[in-house]
Structures are given as C-alpha cells and as structure tokens.
Amino acid sequence: MSLRFIYGRAGSGKSQYCLNSIKNRIEEDIDRPLILLVPEQFSFQAEKNLIEVLDEKTGFKTQVLSFKRMAYRVFNEVGGITAKHMNESGKSMLLYNIIEDNKNNLKVFKKAAKRQGFITTISDIITEFKRYNITPEIILNNLENIEGDNLKYKMEDLALIFSQFETRLHKNYIDNEDDLTILAEKLNKSKQFDNAEIWIDEFSSFSPQEYSVLEKLLLKSYRINITLCTDYLNQGRFVDTTDVFSPIKNTENKLLQIIEDNNIKLDKPIALNCDPCARFKNSAELQHLEKNMFSFPYKEYKNETKDICMLKTLNQFTEIENTAKDIIKLCIDKGCRFKDIAVITGDLEGYENIISSVFLQYNIPFFIDKKREINNNPIIVLILSALEVLSKNWTYESVFRYLKTGLLDINNEEMDILENYVLANGIKGYQWTNDKPWEHKFFSNYELEDQVEKELLAKINDIRYKAMEPIVTLNKNFKSIDKAKEFCEVLYEFLCNINLPDKIQNMIEDFKVEGEIEKASEYNQIWNIVMEVLDQIVEVIGEEKISLKEFFKILQTGLSEYEIGLIPPTLDQVMVGSITRLRSHNINTLYIVGVNDGIFPSPLKEEGILSDDDRKFLGDKGLEIAKDTKSIAFEEQFLVYSTLTTPSKYLRLSYPIADGEGKTLRPSIIISRIKKIFTNICEENDIVKLNGEEEELKNISSAKPTFNYLISNLRKDVEGAKIDNIWGDTYKWYLENEFWIEKLNRLIKGFDYTNQSKYIETKKIRNLYGKPLKISVSRVEKFSQCPFAYFVQYGLKAKDRKIFNLSYPDLGIFMHSILEKFSHELEKQGLEWDTMDLNWAEEEIDKLINEELDNKSLDILNSSKRYEYVTKSVKKILKRSIWLIGEHIKRGNFKPSYYELSFDIDGDYPPIAMELHSGEVVNLIGRVDRVDLLQKDGATYLKIIDYKSGAKEFKLSDVYYGLQLQLLIYLDAILTELAERSGINGEPGALLYLKLDDPIVKNTVDMSDEEIEKSIIKNLKMKGLILNDPNVIRDMDNIISGISDIIPVMVKKDGGVSEGRSSVATKEEFETLRKYVRYTIIEICEEMLEGNIEIKPYKKKDGSSCDYCIYSSVCKFDTNIRGNKYNILIDKKDEEVWDAIKKKLEYKNI
C-alpha cells in the first residue's frame, strides 16, 4: 500500500511516463493487475495512446477505466445494483411531481418552483449533495446550527424535496450519482484491485465520493501513482489561492491527509523537470509561454514569433473565415493533418453555426464535440405540440407547430391553404373541434364567384378534417383517463396511429442516402428516448392521478433533459469544442477563437440556490459542498493555463471587436498579458485592408470561397475599379475547370442583370387592367408613387396575407361607414348638425356601432378584450367627431348637402370621363365623404371634406407630382356636373381634410369646460386649400379673428387674408389647378396603358414610397443594381409650384 506522485508542469510528459511505466511492468512480467484510471471523457483517447505504446499482444494486460467503468466492473463482480438506473430525464420528471405535490409546504421555493429551469437547478443541487456525501438526514441534523431564517428555510425545503426524491426513487430505480457511494462500500468485497498498480492521470481534483473510492483503493492496491500538473509539491502546506496550480496543490493536500489517516506509505515522488519539456521540444515560443504566462515576474521574449500568433477581426464571421483560411494554408504548406487541429471557444453556442457554415464552404472536415439537445427535433416538437394544442385550447401557434413538423399526412400546399384561412378568420379553440364545417368567407364577393368560394371552402374543410382527425381522436381518448400510466398508453397509441415509427425509419434511410450521417444517428436515437421517457413516467408515477396539463409539463420536463451524443464520422477532421473538453484530444495546433472579455476566461457563474455566503457558512459548520463562485474563478486560471499549453506546434488566439449585432467586444486580459510577454508577437488584423498581391493571396484557398472572392473582384473590374493581376490567373483556372466553368459564365452574365422591365406589351396590359379602363383616383395616385407597385397590386392582383386583425385602413373604413349612416339618420330625422341634441347623437353612435358588431364580418371586434377597448375608443372618437362637425357647422353658413357622394355607373354622378390623346375614354370612379354648399351672390360654393383617421396635410407640391389629386378632381367633376346638368354656377370654396380623433388635452386641472373644448377644436383644425375670398372665408368661420382655429387661414386686422400664413388660392388659381389635374391624370393613364411598369419609387426628404410598401420583396429595388434609381421629388415652395404648373400648361397649350 503506497501512494506516489508524478508531477511536472504542462508538457513535461506525465501521461507518457505513465504509459511507459505500464509498458515496463508488462515487460517485467510482474503478476499484478495494471490499471490506468482517467476521467470519463479521456477514456477513448487514453486507450488509443496505450495501444500506440503497447503492442496488440500485451495491450490486453492493462485496463483503462474511469470511475463509472470501475463501478460497473465491481458491481458485475460482487453485485450491488438490483434496480435500473434513472437518468437525468427521469430525475427531472420525478422532481417535478414531488415539487407539485409539496408546493404548499415549501417555505422559500413556492414561487420559484413555477420558473423555467427551476427543476434543473434542484436536480443539480441534489447531485452536488450526493457527490459530497450529504444525505437528507445530515441536512436535517444540522438545521439547528444554521443561523438566519432564509438559509434555514432553504435547507428545510431542500431536505424535504431530497428526502422524498430518495424514497420514491429507490422503489424502482437507483440514481447514477449513487454509483460511486455504492462502489466505495463494495470495494472491500472485490478482488479485482488486490495488489494492483494503478496510474491515475488527467485529474486536477476529485469529489468527496471519488476520494472515498481512492481511499479504499489505496488500502487494497500495491501502489497508486497519481499525476499532478504542478511546478512543485506542496507537502501539506497552506495553499495560496492566487497560485495557478492551487487546485492541484489542494488535491495533493487532501490525498496526503487520506494516507496519513490510514497510515499508508508515501513513495518518493517522480519529478519531471524539463527544459525544454517533451511537448515543446520543437517550439521555444510555446515553452516560453508555458513558463511565463502565470509567472511573476515574467521574462520577456523579444524575438519575432511564428508559433504563437494573434488575430484581431471585425466580427465573429470574419474571425472564423480567417481561421478557415489559416487551417487550409497549414495543411497545404506544412502538411498538417485535420485531426491534429482543434478550434475551441468559451462560447461554443455563439460560434457553432458560424463555424459550421464557414468550414463547410471551405471544405474543412470538422466535428463539433458537444451533445445535441433534442427539443428542436421534429419528432419531439410533434409530440409536445400535440399535447400543447390540447392543454392550451387549440391556439394558432400550437396547432401549426404541430402541423408543420412534416410528420403528418398533409402537404405544403394544403398547409398553406389551411393556414391562410385560419389566420384570416382567427380560428381557435372550439372552432377546431366543432363538427360543423367552417363557413367564413375567404374572399370578398367581387374577388371570386360564389361557386368558386364554395369549392374552396369545401377543400379547406377537407384539409382541416384530414389534418385534425388524429389529434381530435387523441383529445377524446384523453378525456376518459386520469392516471399517468394511461396518458402514456394513449399517447403511444396516437404515435403509432400516425405511423411515426415507420416514418422515422424512412427518414433515417433518406439521411443515409444523402450522406447526412449525423442526422441519421440523431433520428435513430429519438424514438428510443421517447419510449424510455414514457417507461420512466409509468414506473415512477404511473398510478398517480394527474391532469393533461400536468402530463404535458412532466413529459416536457423529461424530454428537455435529454442530449444526444454523436460519434465522429471520420478520424481526420478538425475538432471543434469548448475549452473544458479540449484535453480529451491529442492536438498539436490550436485555434482559440473569441478571446474576449467575458468569454475566455469564462465569466463568474451565477450563485444559484445557495449563495456564496450560504456555502461559506455551511462549510464552516462542517457541511462541505461545492466551491463558491470566487473559488471557481481562481481555479479558472488553471484551465486557461492548461488550454494555452495544450498545443505542441502552433497556437493562434483571435478576438473580434464586435459581435453579430454590432455591439462592441473587448479583448480578454489574456491578450494583453501575452503581448507583454511576447513584445514582438505575430499579430494580424482584417480591419484595415491592405493592397498588394500578398494580401490578395490570403483570399485564395478552397475552390468555393475563392470563387466568391473572384466574382467580387470581377464585379469591381466591370465597374472600373483596379484589381490585382492574380485574379486574372484565378479566372483562367476556373475557366479550365469543367465543374466551375458553367457557374462562372452564369454569374458573369449576372453582372448585366437588372430587375427592371420598363414596359410590357399593350395587349397584355389591357388584359390585366381591363378595357375600357375604369379606375379610382387613388389608383392614379398609386401609379405616381411607383409604376411597378401599381402593376403588382392592380395588374397581378398580389395581396398581402390576410390576418385576423383590424388594421388602420380597416378602422378608417369602419368609422367612415358609421359617419355615413349617422349623417343619413340625421337627415331622416329632419335634424340639423348645428341644432341636434348631443345626447341623442351619442346614443345613435352607440346604436349604429352595436348593430355593426352583430355583423359576422366584424366578429373581430368581439374577439378579445383588446378589441373591446378598440371599440370603446372608436365610439369616443366618433362622438367627438360629430360634436366637432356640429361646431364647424355652427361657425359658418355652409350646409352639408351630400354624404358619400359617389362617381360610378350606379352612383350619384356618373364616372369622371377623361379623354386620352388617342380618343379613348378612361372612367374614374370614387367617393366624396361630404360636400357642403353655400348659396351666395348667385353662385353655389362647394366645400369638399375628406374624413381622415390619421394626419393628412395638403401640399401643392404633391399635387404637382401627381401624389394628391383626389379632392381636386372631385371638385372639378362636381363643378362640371352642376354646370352641365343643372346650369348652376358652381364655385370652389374649400378642399379640406378633417381628422377623426379624440385628442388628449394636457394640464386640464385649471381649465374650464369651454377652454378644453377650444383646445380640442384647435387640435383638430382642418388642413387643405381655401378660396382666397374674405367673405367666403367668414361663411366658413364667422368668428375668425387672426388665426382661425378650424380652417388653415389667418385674417389681418383690415379683414384681408394673410396669404403667407394661409393655405389659399384665388378663383383663377383653382381653375388652373383643375386644368392641371385633368392634364396630369390623362398623362398618368396614358403611361399606364402604354405598359409602363418601371421600378421607380419616389423619394422625398421625409421618406419614399418604399417605406411602407409590401411589395419590396417582389421588386428587389436596390440602388446598387443597374437601372435602379429613385424618382427624386424636391419639395417646392407654393410660389414655385404655381410657376411650374403655369409653365407646363402653357407648354402644352392647355
């Protein structure tokens, strides 16, 4: 019985010494068991290393074990395991059930138990207790020593949960974490390790469970050799926590205490002092780094480095791209093998997708050394979303998460049809399970004939029944059961009914054919995982009564704990992983990416359930548990040391200055430390681009990424920029390569690509727009905004996906409709706006809105509390609006005469006929919200009012550009009709926009009701263009003095109009505008019918027509594409507009 330390710094050859010692023992033919004990993740590499040292004939004489493997060997020999092991998934499900049962008895964790991740946290603390040999009884016995209610209640809660967990677990199972405790108890009966010589390698520390096992082994074995990565032995002295080797020296002290307690001999240690060490014999730089990284004071290395390099990059993507280039260069120039290279990071989750994408492009074989979560696997999504559908009352999200797994008998086209219908009509809850067919109209009557509508509805219902039949059956079967076991049985039947096992097998075969070995391996494990989880539910809580929601939560908890381990598909590949897994691989070239503050070294972990103070207090009372976060932080530097000293040939550290979102990243303190040691270190960056052939050569690596760089340079050449000659040679190489020549020629042709198609044939455009052309004025304005957007909307009739919601345009139409009905009711009752009873008016608004709510097409306003609030808001706005209209009417002599005046074949007036230069007539249709008339001095003055639910300004500049034509063409049409039909002398009075709103008035505490009303009137002042006639103006606002608070006019003290502060036009100017608008519309319509579909959105200083355009994904407008330019519209002053309009009309002889 003896213990021997084998110690030395990193790279000194401790592992090799162990292997050679084993070889020597075999050659000496000493008859005793020879065992190499390593951590679980090192066992595979250790076996490979041992085989390389020993020949095939002698290799079998040595066992490579981990603590877990050792436990299984002993249990097989002497017994000890009579129950199955429960995995992490089963533990989590059991803990969920225990916490649910005891939630009312918990003192501290009652609220926390509802939080996501709490079960995992509790599972982790129980695992920690077990590893530190703490039982529920030990916790309870120490409660009286705990001061402070918070910690005491925490420990009481933990003892309650832990105790019930142990009791219920051991009915049918055993915890994996109990293996080492049982191993320590059973080792006395085992003969396997009697007189054995054991070498223990690659450990930096042990848990109390492992120390217990080591103690038993020390008492049975001939000798235990333990490697320690340290510069010298501590020999039981106090350990300085700032020492990089402090974790190792703490381990040494504990082992010394064990042999002292058991009177075990300490053999003379083996000191592997080396200069240079075996690992660094070919690199003085890496040897210097090992010696000085954590030495104080350190020794500078002044020579230029080639084995240690740094890279500063713009972002994470360019960092990995540069890493890929460097790997290719090493393999080509220095004959490096992919298997000798590792890429590691402290943020594998953040880098995983980038590395996968870039390495695939550079054709670098790689394996990401991590376990995969299964939560996003379609099979798991199908199962959980099916239960979520039933437990969350058939929400849209859960239903389509279930349907979109691709594991049901419904194709993508059927899925899209069903989803569009569901979104458009807000289908949810009972509507899915109701046997009645869905009858909501999918389209408006003018879009599809009734027969087509019926056929489409029939198809939608067929898809619905086919898609929902399995889950509806599942729902019925669930309703008649209440035990966990029964839920598992019904769920299993459901999975078999949809042929899931066969579908999984077919998918596995497809993955194999496509060469996706990792995917095939993943899917191969999933079904067994699901069955294992269901089995554990049955065995642990099978007879307990639970609800569907509880079953869903338990199953979700169980499946969330599973991770899939994948086997590397080949040996020669770059290993990608986290820093903690690095030492399990033999590598000579190491790339550490993401060497940034907070990533490497790792940041302090959260304290968890037990704070650092809690842990210190418990430790002082004799309850030793895992280290606090500060101790772990000190130990992190040993992990940094181990990482930096892993490679034997080449080390590169890289750090981006920004993450994927553009947020600034700072370099790690490790960067500055190494720069101080290596004053002339090899350092590169990709932030400042240098010119020259040498720099361009870095972009030539694998065929695919080089091809992308080539295309980029060829485009520069086409655009007239100078490129390096090397790209000409590269171009020739691709031209001579059969695989690439077609792609190259296709992309070069793409340099001439334009998304423009300025005109299409007149015949085709006629078929799309119809003949004769009949359009609304708003469509004419739309064409002015962008011809292509008009073509897509009205020619191709492309529509945005219909969603069950109330948009602002919908709300505006709704309010217009109510106001129209109210206006007609007012006429019907023989009432006037200026004398109506306001209480009656408000009741009428309520009545009209309530009647509309009973209409099936407005179901949405009854669908939620949110829309109930919207309805209340609409009522307030409309009540405020009718009050405001009444106030406007009171203030003037104009009288409302027409409401929703229409221009159409069956309208109040016929369509507005516009004769084109070809002689063809275009019919304009539309509707005016309100027309007020004034009879004065033998003339009839018109005030045209357009209700707007949002803010709207009148701009002469927009009239000039054809963006604001509606009110003027309506004015022209009405005046024309009055003259031609009735011989009435009509005159323009005003064109106004009235905003429908109920504005909030601030600081009303000291304001009277009258002052509040004045403030509201002023806030809702109309915008537009007024006839520059003081008398007519007073007929619109008979109390005007200075600036009007209802119309955009200011009068001077002498009664004249202040033209600079008013939006006014003379009778002659109105006439000019009428001519200009007719001319503009004719020009636009002719352009439209000529087939102009140019992608030419307007752009002004306050925005462009692209800002809210839903067709941007269709046109792909981009000013970098040839021919893509904005139609720049410069805002003109009113004087400039008048001048420009007159000049244009004169030029056209109009």
Curated annotation (Swiss-Prot):
Its EC number is 3.1.-.-. Binds 1 [4Fe-4S] cluster. InterPro entries: ADDB_N (IPR049035), DNA_helicase_suAddB (IPR014140), P-loop_NTPase (IPR027417), PDDEXK-like_dom_sf (IPR011604), PDDEXK_AddAB-type (IPR038726). Signal peptide: none annotated. Keywords: 4Fe-4S, ATP-binding, DNA damage, DNA repair, DNA-binding, Exonuclease, Helicase, Hydrolase, Iron, Iron-sulfur, Metal-binding, Nuclease, Nucleotide-binding. HAMAP family: AddB_type1. Despite having conserved helicase domains, this subunit does not have helicase activity. Heterodimer of AddA and AddB. This is ATP-dependent helicase/deoxyribonuclease subunit B.
